[in-house]
């Protein structure tokens, strides 16, 4: 029996799945973040090693140093350029050579697959390698691949340069609308009251204290998108316009990916991933209606599997290639 590791490494945590050649998950391990560009190589390597060890410990099989693990796929945040891939492959090889991985043989270079976290999200979401992943959580990005293996990325430029249609984008637009109404220069909206109540503020001027002086980051601000979503679901016109604008941005990015990968006669799947899609304002439904107009044969789906499972599938593909 052959085994593989599938690893999903992000800025918050690292997940490793131990899978067999029949695509059965035998073990799962979690550790800290593994974005080497923000943490450094050593800390990223430690998180990956720990996630692997924990996956093996949780496996329902007898595990020893002779476990026949033949391939590994690491889908990591911030990995996209050839240089990034070389760096990750090097430190995985280093883990093998220092005997810090419980494997019976050194992996061939082709069996150390390194790709972006978007790629494994697509494969995990659809269960195969073709289609489009529309990811909208704290940030946003669209990533697709066609049946010929051509890939297309749209967006993903971060909260300063991009991330249109993301939770952060929605939250910032909502906060700005609330403050404009508070100033008397904006359209009336219940967002002002909702933010004030949710954050426990005496007035909206205290937002300065919350956002700037408490050192709120992108993730904390993005969490406020739920307030905008709820206000839109309750019929607030300003909030609804913000949600519509966010969906329009995601549609534009998706349309760009489609035009670069598929033609009008092809059927393919579009998987929606991230917290924005699960709100009360029916972002998913709005998105589906718009997609049907630009890609009639496309099917919008929810993720079938998690990204780490997608990494495992890519590792298995490496064995069969």
Where are these regions (language model features)?
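Short beta-strand-loop/turn "lid" adjacent to the catalytic site in phosphate-handling enzymes
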Residues: 55-96, 104-105, 113-114, 123-126
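Short glycine-aspartate micro-motif
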Residues: 4-8, 69-73, 113, 131-135, ...
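ATP-binding/phosphotransfer module of carbohydrate and carboxylate kinases, centering on a glycine-rich
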Residues: 1-68, 124-130, 177-321
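Glycine-rich beta-strand-to-loop/alpha-helix junction loops that act as flexible
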Residues: 73-80, 136-138, 268-279
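Active-site neighborhood for divalent-cation/phosphate handling
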Residues: 101-133, 144-152
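Glycine/charged-rich beta-loop-alpha catalytic/anionic-binding loops adjacent to active sites
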Residues: 102-106, 150-158, 290-299
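A short glycine/serine-rich beta->alpha loop
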Residues: 36-38, 78-79, 156-164, 297-302
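Glycine-rich phosphate-binding loop of actin/hexokinase-like ATP-binding domains
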Residues: 128-186
